[in-house]
From Swiss-Prot:
<keyword id="KW-0472">Membrane</keyword>
<dbReference type="GO" id="GO:0016020">
    <property type="term" value="C:membrane"/>
</dbReference>
<feature type="transmembrane region" description="Helical">
    <location>
        <begin position="48"/>
        <end position="70"/>
    </location>
</feature>
<dbReference type="GO" id="GO:0004497">
    <property type="term" value="F:monooxygenase activity"/>
</dbReference>
<comment type="function">
    <text>Anthrone oxygenase; part of the gene cluster that mediates the biosynthesis of agnestins, dihydroxy-xanthone metabolites. The pathway begins with the assembly and cyclization of atrochrysone thioester by the non-reducing polyketide synthase Agnpks1. The atrochrysone carboxyl ACP thioesterase AgnL7 then breaks the thioester bond and releases the atrochrysone carboxylic acid as the first enzyme-free intermediate.</text>
</comment>
<dbReference type="InterPro" id="IPR013901">
    <property type="entry name" value="Anthrone_oxy"/>
</dbReference>
<comment type="similarity">
    <text>Belongs to the anthrone oxygenase family.</text>
</comment>
<comment type="pathway">
    <text>Secondary metabolite biosynthesis.</text>
</comment>
<protein>
    <recommendedName>
        <fullName>Anthrone oxygenase AgnL2</fullName>
        <ecNumber>1.10.3.-</ecNumber>
    </recommendedName>
</protein>
<dbReference type="Pfam" id="PF08592">
    <property type="entry name" value="Anthrone_oxy"/>
</dbReference>
<keyword id="KW-0560">Oxidoreductase</keyword>
<keyword id="KW-0812">Transmembrane</keyword>
<feature type="transmembrane region" description="Helical">
    <location>
        <begin position="85"/>
        <end position="105"/>
    </location>
</feature>
<keyword id="KW-1133">Transmembrane helix</keyword>
<keyword id="KW-0503">Monooxygenase</keyword>
<feature type="transmembrane region" description="Helical">
    <location>
        <begin position="11"/>
        <end position="31"/>
    </location>
</feature>
């Protein structure tokens, strides 16, 4: 694969990744909030949305990062200073994974716990407003995480012009 092709593919996959992620916060979560009247249903729907996102999005982040790493490696071997921009683009893109572990896991665990409890018929102990507030918190964290591959794509697209 040529370096230019790897760079272009990384930018496209990073942009697609960010768009797919942002659509969850900007479209899917608002639909859940507008159409769900019971905490049990809200937790179940969130878990399904999380499940499908988890199937695809982390893998895309790693693949995008590997494409940036390949581009950075080829540029470095060619002694082009722009290699550092591509290395940074990859690092920023994959930083969504440790962000998830450090910032989102507590909220995720609460949501997973509430979904599991209500699935077993136990009361959640919260009304719909509290459940919605928890989902809004998750949505803002997820939106923040979604910006990381976007920042990587912006850097990746400007790589040669930023530092050549």
């Amino acid at each position: 694969m040529s370096t230019t092709s790897a760079q272009a593919t990384a930018v496209v996959t990073g942009s697609f990744l960010s768009g797919a992620m942002i659509s969850l916060s900007l479209m899917a979560v608002p639909v859940l909030l507008d159409t769900t009247t019971e905490p049990t249903q809200l937790f179940f729907q969130w878990r399904r949305m999380y499940h499908y996102g988890h199937q695809v999005l982390p893998t895309m982040a790693v693949a995008t990062t590997l494409l940036y790493a390949y581009t950075a490696s080829k540029r470095r071997r060619a002694q082009k200073p722009s290699w550092a921009v591509f290395a940074l683009a990859g690092t920023i893109t994959v930083s969504m994974i440790p962000f998830t572990w450090l910032c989102m896991v507590p909220t995720n665990n609460v949501l997973f716990g509430l979904e599991a409890a209500t699935r077993l018929g136990e009361p959640s102990g919260m009304g719909i407003e509290e459940a919605q507030a928890l989902l809004v918190k998750w949505s803002w964290l997820h939106f923040t995480r979604s910006l990381m591959p976007l920042m990587g794509a912006i850097l990746g697209s400007l790589g040669e012009t930023v530092w050549n």
